[in-house]
Amino acid sequence: MIKNKKQKSYTSVYALGQYISMSAHKARRVIDQIRGRSYEEALMILELMPYRGCYPIFKLVYSAAANASHNKGFKETNLVISKAEVNQGNTVKKLKPRARGRSYPIKRSTCHITIVLEDTSFYQQYEEYLMYLKKPGYSNENRNLTCYDTYSSGGLWDKK
C-alpha cells in the first residue's frame, strides 16, 4: 500500500473534533452553510442558526482560528474556511429496558468534523504578480464556442 505524504501548507491550519455525539447527516446540514465563507461571517451564521449541531461546530471554528493566530500568527480577519468535512464516527449501541423483560436497542451515532482555515493575506500580497503571470488576451470572451444542435440543423427530422 502506497501512502501519499502530506505536504506542509504554510497558509492553512485545521481543527479536528472527534466523537461528537451527533449524526453525520445533521452535522453536514450545518457545515454546508459555512463552507467557503470568511471566519467572522461563519461565526455569525453559527450563532444565529437554530440547530443543536451549531454549538460544537462553532467551538471547532473558534479553535481553528485560535490555532491560526497562536501557532502561525495569522490575523483572524483574513481567514476563510477552505475545507470543512464531516465523517461518520463510531455508533454506540445500548439496550433500553422495556416492559415485560424486553429491551430495545438504542443507536447513538457520532461523527468526526474537520475544519480547515486558510489565510488569504498571502494571495492579496501577490495578486498583481499573479495577474501578470496570466496570459494576456486569454478570456472566455475570446473563445469561439459554437454548439451544433442536431435537431435544429435543418436535417431530416425537421421536415414532416
Swiss-Prot record:
Source taxon at top rank: Eukaryota
Compartments, as annotated in UniProt: Plastid, Chloroplast
GO biological process: translation
One Pfam family matching this protein: Ribosomal_L22
Gene3D superfamilies the UniProt entry points to: Ribosomal protein L22/L17 (3.90.470.10)
Membrane-spanning ranges: none
Major location (coarse): plastid
GO molecular function ontology, one term from the record: structural constituent of ribosome
GO CC term (a single one): chloroplast
Keywords: Chloroplast, Plastid, Ribonucleoprotein, Ribosomal protein, RNA-binding, rRNA-binding
Annotated HAMAP family: Ribosomal_uL22_B
Subunit structure: Part of the 50S ribosomal subunit.
Protein family: Belongs to the universal ribosomal protein uL22 family.
Function: This protein binds specifically to 23S rRNA. The globular domain of the protein is located near the polypeptide exit tunnel on the outside of the subunit, while an extended beta-hairpin is found that lines the wall of the exit tunnel in the center of the 70S ribosome.
Name recorded for this polypeptide: Large ribosomal subunit protein uL22c
Organism (species): Arabis hirsuta
